[in-house]
Amino acid sequence: MTTGRQILEKEIMIAGRPLKLTAGKVATQASGSVLVSYGDTVVLVTATGSKEPREGIDFFPLTVDYEERFYAVGKIPGGFIKREGRPSEKAILSARLIDRPIRPLFPKGFKNDVHIVATVLSVNQDNPPEIAAMNGASAALTLSHLPFLGPIGAVVVGLVEDELVINPTIEQAEKSRLHLVVAGTRDAVMMVEAGAQEVPEEIMIEAITRGHEEVKKIVAFIEEFREEALKLGLAKEKMEVVVEEKAELKEAVTAEAYPLLKEAIEKIIAEKFNKQERDEYLENLKKELTTKFLETYPEEELTIKGILDSIQKEIVRQKILKEGIRIDGRKTDEVRPIWCEVGLLPRTHGSGLFTRGQTQVLSIVTLGAVGDVQILDDLGIEESKRFMHHYNFPPYSVGEVRPMRGPGRREIGHGALAERALEPVIPPEEVFPYTIRIVSEVLESNGSTSMGSVCGSTLALMDAGVPIKAPVAGVAMGLIKEGDEVAILTDIQGIEDALGDMDFKVAGTKDGITALQMDIKIAGVTRDILTKALAQAREGRMHILGKMLEVISEPRKELSPYAPRIIFTTVDPEKIRDIIGPGGKIIKKIIDETGVKIDIEDDGRIFIAAVDKEAGEKALNIIENLTKEIEVGKVYLGKVTRIADFGAFVEVVPGVLGLPGKEGLVHISQLAHSRVKRVEDVVKEGDQILVKAIGYDNQGRLKLSRKDAIPAEEVREKKNPPIHKPRREGK
């Protein structure tokens, strides 16, 4: 087909499937656009940027949008409106995955707005669209005029039967103990995100290394793609980023401010200032210095503030590298003081308060019925979720004022990380048939709140009596590297988060890692450094676990009296209609009468949730009566409900809640061993009689027999009782 356009297509085999990039075919008005195909998964990724830098900001304004389209999986959106609306949590997490490895690869001082849009057009579940989007974003930026210092590549690494697998299929992913996303450049790993089933540190390092080997192939492929695109006019020359050095200003500020800031930091360490005292002290000093320098350089307020922040960062880094002392006086491997508490809230199902230094998280567990699961309406194959963790970060936790308008991307990301850390220890539905929701409320924040949420949630789960596989703890780590000097920091706080070269969060049990999130900002982080960092993180994790287990060593044996009790039973799937009734009439009546929640699965599993145990047992009894099978050949004590000329109707299973019981017909010929002229001669309405189930007629109606329930010998004896002759005397 002739398009009249220059089109470039190129592909590479990754994990046995073709990864194809197409440029020049669609969305050509964007600065960079690529159609990425990985198997049958297709994603359009575009990159655009503003012509001028944004004034008055001190950050890089990058926005990433990940747009899910339901047509990609042949679905129409649910709900009334029938079109896509706000991004799902999965879409937000995918956007964060794209953002994190590319953000550090723009020049310092670049302030132009950059917008990445990844639109999912077609999905084959074996080829995850978020990985295609990550590689597509890298390619689109590489083709654009934007000063991107990439490209990067991205893959997923799984662990199936102790073998590392690149980009596992859905079938392999179900068996995998690891889901590890690795993104990086030719020279360095930039980002790692993992969920794992207690995977040891050494295997995690091996998986990261294996993933980076595959990433290098993708990076080389994108570089070749750009070279060919340039020849066809499908790639643009990179723009120059001119950042005025202002050497004279920097020299003047540094000369005066460095000794003053160093002295201030020494004082903070010596007198053990807390976060508020430290922030106030440093801000006041920097404000005084800024005011002074503005007299000479009145147009340079932002620049002066930036120089002062850089000086502060450098002093704190050097203090750590040269002396091994952090700004709060701790050693590099030291964890802040910890205290924990459980059972704070009397009416909740479980609660845990975790405090580490000036980071404090209150986690609350709620147990629900099977029907309380979250219904998922996205592009994935999962339809529901029975374990949820939600994270809230109110402004008061950092002493700030700002409007509260629901969870932002950061809160969704932190909540998902903690959920991923805890999920491997949550008992399966067969063992613990509850829906579990945890909410972590950040009450104080000075770094590492997501890992604090993991710890608080573990305490709350054990307080709630959830039989978790093992307790989980998490710790946030940092790395500072200059040349050959390296310092690894355990349990970083807020001020240390921004000044490091790598920050990573590790959660797990005593046996292995359950979640890992790592962002690396520099090249040269070797395998040895990663190994040492994860080993130090394990030491910190074990210390934290020890403190938690001092408060509660195992899950409680009993649930909260306010938690629902779930009674489980199974019935023949054919009997489900007997429980539900026409238009749901019967099940509604059971629920109204007992106050329970009833969830019925298509396979016949029934879950009854009731706070009152007696109510649950009452509902179970009703269901058992409704579904009770009448066994042919068995004798029942029944009640005569109606008399007809041709026989008597007998109820063998009594009705409940005004609902009919189960009855059958005793035909007149089955009433007695002798001939019966009138039914009333043998039984009357209201009589209780023994009957035997003898089968069903061709319409499925139960047939009963009274005579078969009474042996003929017994009947004869009643008609002709034996004559007892009097004994003769003397005999």
From Swiss-Prot:
Sequence ranges assigned to domain KH in this UniProt record: 564-623
Keyword Transferase in record: yes
Binding site for Mg(2+): 497, 503
One term of GO molecular function: polyribonucleotide nucleotidyltransferase activity
DNA-binding is among the record's keywords: no
Primary subcellular site in the record, as a coarse category: cytoplasm
Compartments, record wording: Cytoplasm
Start and end residues of each S1 motif domain: 633-707
Cross-referenced CDD domains: KH-I_PNPase, RNase_PH_PNPase_1, RNase_PH_PNPase_2, S1_PNPase
Cofactor(s) demanded: Mg(2+)
Catalytic activity as recorded in UniProt: RNA(n+1) + phosphate = RNA(n) + a ribonucleoside 5'-diphosphate
Listed GO CC annotations: cytosol
Gene3D superfamilies in alphabetical order: GHMP Kinase, N-terminal domain, K Homology domain, type 1, Nucleic acid-binding proteins
Pfam families: KH_1 (PF00013), PNPase (PF03726), RNase_PH (PF01138), RNase_PH_C (PF03725), S1 (PF00575)
Entry keyword set: Cytoplasm, Magnesium, Metal-binding, Nucleotidyltransferase, RNA-binding, Transferase
SUPFAM superfamilies: Eukaryotic type KH-domain (KH-domain type I), Nucleic acid-binding proteins, Polynucleotide phosphorylase/guanosine pentaphosphate synthase (PNPase/GPSI), domain 3, Ribonuclease PH domain 2-like, Ribosomal protein S5 domain 2-like
The enzyme's E.C. designation: 2.7.7.8
GO biological process entries: mRNA catabolic process; RNA processing
InterPro entries: ExoRNase_PH_dom1 (IPR001247), ExoRNase_PH_dom2 (IPR015847), ExoRNase_PH_dom2_sf (IPR036345), KH_dom (IPR004087), KH_dom_type_1 (IPR004088), KH_dom_type_1_sf (IPR036612), NA-bd_OB-fold (IPR012340), PNPase (IPR012162)
PANTHER family: POLYRIBONUCLEOTIDE NUCLEOTIDYLTRANSFERASE, POLYRIBONUCLEOTIDE NUCLEOTIDYLTRANSFERASE 1, MITOCHONDRIAL
HAMAP family named in the record: PNPase
Functional summary from the UniProt entry: Involved in mRNA degradation. Catalyzes the phosphorolysis of single-stranded polyribonucleotides processively in the 3'- to 5'-direction.
Family: Belongs to the polyribonucleotide nucleotidyltransferase family.
Protein name, as recorded: Polyribonucleotide nucleotidyltransferase
Species of provenance: Carboxydothermus hydrogenoformans (strain ATCC BAA-161 / DSM 6008 / Z-2901)
